[in-house]
């Protein structure tokens, strides 16, 4: 662009003029009217111009308002500052009018001509006083000959490019020759536009569609140096070319320009009619107006195709428009054209009916498209909908149409004439989709126009799969759908490689050769490539990376310290303190990796190692159960903990899997969050017969009546729901009794006393002399706000009652001392000496003691439903007994309370205190019984009753044992039919059941399970059924550990912990072993094979750990990188010399490829000599 083009026209009076109506002028004050008549701001800034009509009115005296209201409003709408362009009646101005018009741009000229009354005195005066101005920039007729695509609007005030307006999405809508070039008119601007690649593409597109356009624009395409030369004009020079005004895409007035017959199109006239070539170019706009009418004007500039835009903007494809003819073809509609996507938040805002409607519509669209076209890969959205998984995407831009284009638009495909025949054959050789192949040579650029000059924001061209990569990287393979790349060496050795690698999970783009090069030089990939399959007759060996003993010894200190931090839920800042403590004992600790960031990274690899082992055991388990525990952490973030109950060999395990934050606390929100978390962890929960139980905590959303169980049963029909999560049962019971007035008062009084002593160390020390247990409990419950119900803690109530006499005497002494503190103590002493309060605390101890055995039974790892039922039955009996007679603690109170005194201290007893106590006591007991019935008995599936048949203590003896439990076994087998072998025989199952009863009588349930599972050859059907029964979640020990761990980790001081770090810490704290039993070597090896350990380039070999055979094979590395099995040798491998101990972790030079690398025969890594 010429430098002068960016300049701006001088400011004129019309640019800053404000016209008022008569009614508006009357409202102004005299000072405001005088200010309106001042012309001191504009006159000194430029050359002298004609005195405007407005100031002449001020000079003559009449009021300067405008004429009629309608005429005034019409005038204001045509003002140059408004949206619409002014009207110029005639371009061929004669005489003095043309002379005066040369000093103004077309907009100004049009405006002044509209103001004139026919006498022309304004323009004449203007021209007479402004003869020194430069020659104006006006529209020249020769431009229409030089630029065949140039057209004008009806008012003759703006220029347009007919080719670019035909394809508005190709060019930025804000381009001047698309919106309307209104001046200052320069031929350089037209030349610059003619040379632009977007314009050239539009010209080629029109030429490819219509041969008449091709003939007219042949001169533009053929000579690449001068694309503007044209042998003949497209339009006549005698008449201007008209184009409908208005915003881009507004074709309402196009009908006025269209002729009534085809003959008019073929016979261009010379009387100012529209040329046939132009009308043929726009003949299909009416159909486009109908099809695109449902879209708003803002949607008109949506790109027809991402690949087309990138082809235009790609600098590497400059010659494309000159050499390659463009062919337009209507590609078949694909699913992406009619798909609508939602983000996670937007999906959560939909109700159940809207989600079901969305699922039905998407499935119907896919089925319709599948019936109309050839078979194609099933879209990921449809797969998610069929699995009833959450269909939201992670794109934060919200709902979108497929890949960014609305349905029904045409795709434009550019192909070379010379390669037309060979393209079909080459496309079969390219391991990528056709769309990706077309987009491979393209890039995109986005033009943005801000307050200043135009800025161009360029984006990189889209990356596609290249054929040359498969020759450059022999290990590179592609999936059948041709959308993902994999490393064939790494996917065959998943235990050696980090599964988070993109080329192990599936590389889906953006495809870059740098990613492949980076993967090729990684330690994990080289280890996988340098291993070969052992001969089929030799036992399989486990290959592990060989790390120097010095490196392993140094890193063990860091990983042990990091594991201790995570296991005990300590702050991450304590990591450096632990290392300093180790160093003070004489342990050699490296100077690096001593900060919080390094500790977080080590915990990450520790947790990933634990998770990998757990998930592998879960996938190998014959059946599993899912346990859900909803909670709200210290940051008030609602989340759901997911646990898995599974078999590890012959042992039942419960492990924490993840803590998923909830975006919506509804049944749909829970379901989609849980399904997404399980899918992300690659847990095959949809496999028929694999998931047998669903344990919930009984909350409103997770219960059977909440709808979540029904949603899971749609995916897993045989799922057995169990309300099993019962951690802190006593807290839940007191919470259920929270509506009772006496319970709330009791809890409030205890909190008041505790806060009174916590606020003063002096009073706390005085209390310690006679009430040591209470003083210790007050110190332990330092943060009372974190305790929901203090009255639910048996330990707190017991300490309060034991220390009650000393507490009352101390409060009496403080009250006698007087003052403000004494007044507070006097009020608390009155509460502590209340008969109602003291006796109800004794009753609460008896009440909570009944729930303790039931809570302990529910926290066992292996427990039979009969044991839970027996404990539950005893709890019902104890509660009924407590309802009618006093418990042990209450009897103790009755025995000690004599003559209105308890332990020598007088109690304030009201006349109706005993009656109120008995009423509240019975109400509390009934509420507790109702809670247990709702918690354990409501909606209880009959299969749990059938499982009681495995309680050997309830088996009959003699002949009755032969037919005992047959119906229960058959009912269980029919319900869990998917978990048993296909076509099993019920007679064979009953025979196995009879055999088990003869050998396992009087055995406890745990021994019965181990015997049945160990003898799976003898009991092939019954062992599988027994595994299902054991997997049903009855106990909740893992949920209890996870609940406590989360409260220790995310406290009020650590509310900003991310969910990723929280999951890492909980994975280690819940699933980890004791610190003294932890082996850090697997985590160190995992760290060593990832990017964090890549800086340590030690001798890169792999040590073989034989599985069965004691003989170890040697691996030899040849020049080409291939390995083969070699006979054992006695020659020792070359070992790199070691430097000083402080330089152990520095990079070492790798052995040359022609050298042989041998692993050591021993399990221990070689030391650095």
Swiss-Prot record:
Predominant place of localization: nucleus
Key words of the record: Disease variant, Metal-binding, Nucleus, Repeat, Transcription, Transcription regulation, Zinc, Zinc-finger
Compartments reported by the entry: Nucleus
PANTHER family: RAS-ASSOCIATING DOMAIN-CONTAINING PROTEIN, ZINC FINGER PROTEIN 862
GO CC annotation: nucleus
Residues annotated as domain KRAB: 11-77, 333-404
Biological process according to GO: regulation of DNA-templated transcription
Its job: May be involved in transcriptional regulation.
Name recorded for this polypeptide: Zinc finger protein 862
UniProt xrefs under PROSITE patterns: KRAB
Pfam families: Dimer_Tnp_hAT, KRAB
Annotated disease: Fibromatosis, gingival, 6: An autosomal dominant form of hereditary gingival fibromatosis, a rare condition characterized by a slow, progressive overgrowth of the gingiva. The excess gingival tissue can cover part of or the entire crown, and can result in diastemas, teeth displacement, or retention of primary or impacted teeth. GINGF6 is characterized by gingival overgrowth beginning in the first decade of life.
Entry-linked SMART domains: KRAB (SM00349), ZnF_TTF (SM00597)
Originating gene: ZNF862
Zinc finger (TTF-type): 135-218, 461-544
Lineage of producing organism: Eukaryota, Metazoa, Chordata, Craniata, Vertebrata
An MF annotation (GO) of this entry: zinc ion binding
